UniProtKB/Swiss-Prot annotation:
It is found in: Cytoplasm. It holds the Pfam family PGK. It comes from Leuconostoc citreum (strain KM20). PANTHER family: PHOSPHOGLYCERATE KINASE, PHOSPHOGLYCERATE KINASE 1, CHLOROPLASTIC-RELATED. This is Phosphoglycerate kinase. GO terms for biological process: gluconeogenesis; glycolytic process. SUPFAM superfamilies: Phosphoglycerate kinase. It is an enzyme of class 2 (transferase). Keywords: ATP-binding, Cytoplasm, Glycolysis, Kinase, Nucleotide-binding, Transferase. Its main location: cytoplasm. CDD domains: Phosphoglycerate_kinase. ATP binds at K212, G301, E332, G361, G362, D363, S364. One of its GO terms (molecular function) is ADP binding. Pathway: Carbohydrate degradation; glycolysis; pyruvate from D-glyceraldehyde 3-phosphate: step 2/5.
């Protein structure tokens, strides 16, 4: 069944509740990266242009004490949103109460209001109660009552969580629609899982097998090839009996890696060489080491080597759908970023050849942005954990709560 979207709604004159994902990096009131704010603009603008009255909810960081609230107000985010929209965003420094209700009731058509950080509700009078993050039913009902029975969920990044500001509001209104960003995420990730154009190649990187094991299992059942890189690859190398020196690995996951390799056969593509370093430092002494020769003691693998890059390029050469989540090495150090950046470059070629390319996860997204190729790929997912769980085939509460057409 197709989900209800923002373009299916009658918005004029309505108080429209919207969950957005404005969980941006912020330090001393300065926003480090406003990508998530920019990503929500199409939906917000659509509501305003159609004479709706937009009431925005978002979380920011984690609130565990009253002190956290001083650092994590959404006031700077509201100011930045106003600059991007070119109009005043009314900010209310509360999550409930008379001031908030009056401000919402005073809104005119085409105006926008931002509610304070929804996670301020997780700490009340200094006590951690988690009203927002544990989906307190009274809170969801209260927030739902601030609007006109309409709710737009455009926060894919929190779709894997059942919070008061997404699932709680949704369960108390009659029409719940996906915003344009949510709609795009569902389309690209949903098609990749359910109906990929083949060959379908998945690339999974990152430090730990334990973080990504479910996604690797799930993708081995769906994809034609699954490339595994990053720190997690050394657990597979250890499972093959190869020397990994001082490389990161999880001893308790070696048996699991053996089972996966036995089941997957040649579907699973592992690095064949590494850039090994004598210290966890960009200035470390390095050498290229074949996996079969092994990494010597005192050295650790910090990136995939040139033969592995060539193997990845060959594996991706005829791909028609590619999903990438996680770096191939210690991407934040320039000397160990080559493998990760090479994937970004290869994905541009796949896209130019008519393929669909989907990137998720902070490091992978940072890599394509560093290369300046984000706009040359099909889709950059805004959800880290949410995109992984969706690709695993799990039902996400935030998506499940959106109305069917």
């Amino acid at each position: 069944m197709a989900k209800l979207t923002v373009s299916d709604l009658e918005l004029s004159g309505k108080k429209v509740l919207m969950r957005v994902d404005f969980n941006v990096p912020i330090k001393a009131g300065v926003i480090g990266n406003d990508n998530r704010i920019v990503a929500a603009l199409p939906t917000i603008k659509y509501v305003l242009e159609n004479n709706g009255r937009a009431i925005l909810f978002s979380h920011l960081g984690r609130i565990k004490s009253e002190d956290d609230k001083k650092e994590l107000s959404l006031a700077p985010v509201a100011a930045r949103l106003g600059e991007l929209l070119g109009k005043n965003v009314k900010f209310v420094p509360h999550t409930r109460g008379e001031e908030l209700e009056s401000a919402i009731n005073a809104l005119q058509d085409g105006e926008v209001l931002m509610v304070e950080n929804t996670r301020f509700e997780d700490v009340v009078d200094g006590v951690e109660v988690k009203n927002e993050s544990k989906n307190n039913p009274e809170l969801g009902k209260y927030w739902a009552g601030l609007g006109d029975d309409l709710f737009i969920n455009d926060a894919f990044g929190t779709a894997h969580r059942a919070h008061a500001s997404n699932v709680g509001i949704a369960s108390n209104v009659s029409q719940v629609a996906a915003g344009f960003l949510m709609e795009k995420e569902i389309k690209f990730l949903g098609d990749a899982v359910a109906n990929p154009v083949r060959p379908f190649v998945a690339i999974i990187g990152g430090a730990k097998v334990s973080d990504k094991i479910e996604i690797v299992k799930s993708l081995l059942a769906k994809a034609d090839k699954v490339i595994v890189g990053g720190g997690m690859a050394y657990t597979f190398d250890a499972a093959k009996g190869e020397k990994i020196g001082n490389s990161l690995f999880e001893a308790d996951k070696v048996e699991l890696a053996k089972e996966l390799m036995a089941e997957a056969g040649d579907k699973l593509v592992l690095p064949v060489d590494s850039i090994a370093a004598d210290a966890f430092s960009n200035d470390a002494k390095t050498e290229v080491v074949d996996a079969t020769a092994g990494i010597p003691d005192g050295y650790m693998g910090l990136d995939i080597g040139p033969k592995s890059v060539k193997l990845l390029q060959d594996t991706l050469a005829d791909a028609k759908t590619v999903v990438w989540n996680g770096p191939m090495g210690v991407f934040e150090m320039p000397n160990f970023a080559k493998g990760t950046l090479a994937i970004g470059e290869e994905l541009v070629k796949v896209t130019e050849n008519g393929g669909t390319t989907i990137v998720g996860g902070g490091d992978s997204t940072a890599a394509v942005q560093q290369l300046g190729v984000a706009d040359k790929l099909s889709h950059i997912s805004t959800g880290g954990g949410a995109s992984l769980e969706y690709l695993e085939g799990k039902e996400l509460p935030g998506i499940a709560s959106i109305s069917e057409k």
